[in-house]
Each structure stands twice: as C-alpha cells, then as structure tokens.
Amino acid sequence: MIYYLSYIRNGGQFMHTFLIVLLIIDCIALITVVLLQEGKSSGLSGAISGGAEQLFGKQKQRGVDLFLNRLTIILSILFFVLMICISYLGM
C-alpha cells in the first residue's frame, strides 16, 4: 500500500481530490450519525440526582443504538485513515 501511495504521490492530483471528497462525505456522515444518537445523560439535574442509575445500572445497547454506535466507530476510523492518506499525499 505504501508503494501504491508513493506512486500516486508523484502524479496524484486526482487521487488527492478524490480522498478530500471522501473525507467531506465521511465528515458529514459522522456528524449526522452522532446527532442521531440518543443522549446518555439527563443534563445537570441527572448529574445531581439520578447519576447513580447510569453509573451502576448495566444497560446494553440494542437495535438502532447499537447500530449507530458501531457506525460511529467505523466512520471515526475511516476519518483518521483518510487524514493519514491525505497528509502522506500532501508531502
């Protein structure tokens, strides 16, 4: 993969633009997925009174929450990989 990136680095304006477009799409998707997730805290009143239930209660994520959590992890990893590739091509 490093050889491929160094090959593209020499004449890779198209690849650089393509990776930037992928990064923008990934950023928009990551922001959307994070905003779709349910809040895990009750705000300030939950921190004062009802925080023990969240701390000691074990609730597993199911369904949509689990899917959004995993999708957030995947999109975050993709974000960092794209950033590393773009910075390598920019050298």
Swiss-Prot record:
GO terms for molecular function: protein-transporting ATPase activity. Keywords: Cell membrane, Membrane, Protein transport, Translocation, Transmembrane, Transmembrane helix, Transport. Disruption phenotype: Grows normally, a double secG/secY2 mutant enters stationary phase earlier. Significant differences in the export pattern of a number of extracellular proteins are seen in a secG deletion; the double secG/secY2 mutant exacerbates this effect (shown in RN4220). Single or double deletions are as virulent as wild-type (shown in RN4220 and SH1000). The chain crosses the membrane at residues 16-36, 71-91. GO terms for cellular component: plasma membrane. The keyword Protein biosynthesis does not apply. It is a multi-pass membrane protein. Pfam families: SecG (PF03840). It is found in: Cell membrane. GO terms for biological process: intracellular protein transmembrane transport; protein secretion; protein transport by the Sec complex. Subunit of the protein translocation channel SecYEG. While not essential, it considerably increases the export efficiency of extracellular proteins. Belongs to the SecG family. Component of the Sec protein translocase complex. Heterotrimer consisting of SecY, SecE and SecG subunits. The heterotrimers can form oligomers, although 1 heterotrimer is thought to be able to translocate proteins. Interacts with SecDF, and other proteins may be involved. The channel interacts with SecA via subunit SecY. Also part of the accessory SecA2/SecY2 protein translocation apparatus required to export cell wall protein GspB. This is Protein translocase subunit SecG.
